[in-house]
Amino acid sequence: MRLTILLIIIGLIGYIINSGPLGRTNIIKLFISIEIMLLGVTLLIILSGYNNDDILGLIIGIIVLIITGIESAIGLTILVNYYKIKGSLPTNI
């Protein structure tokens, strides 16, 4: 339980630091921070399903991990292709 809260907080802090007036916006770091937060929430779903002996929580957690992997691959592919075409990544979001 502590690990999941720690992952969510680390992702949130990373998102806040890498966006807005606190730092230069880096879209890759924002993407990674969002993925860390989603991993924390998914781990929380899996652990709650395991603690309650509920198979549905485990199944939903696995489905979320699969969808997250697909979403990460598509997002990174779009960013790489954008970088190849434009020569730089957007810093204004």
Curated annotation (Swiss-Prot):
Gene3D superfamilies: 1.10.287.3510. One of its GO terms (cellular component) is NADH dehydrogenase complex. It catalyses: a ubiquinone + NADH + 5 H(+)(in) = a ubiquinol + NAD(+) + 4 H(+)(out). Keywords: Electron transport, Membrane, Mitochondrion, NAD, Respiratory chain, Translocase, Transmembrane, Transmembrane helix, Transport, Ubiquinone. The chain crosses the membrane at residues 3-23, 27-47, 55-75. It is found in: Mitochondrion membrane. PANTHER family: NADH-UBIQUINONE OXIDOREDUCTASE CHAIN 4L (PTHR11434:SF16), NADH-UBIQUINONE OXIDOREDUCTASE SUBUNIT ND4L (PTHR11434). This is NADH-ubiquinone oxidoreductase chain 4L.
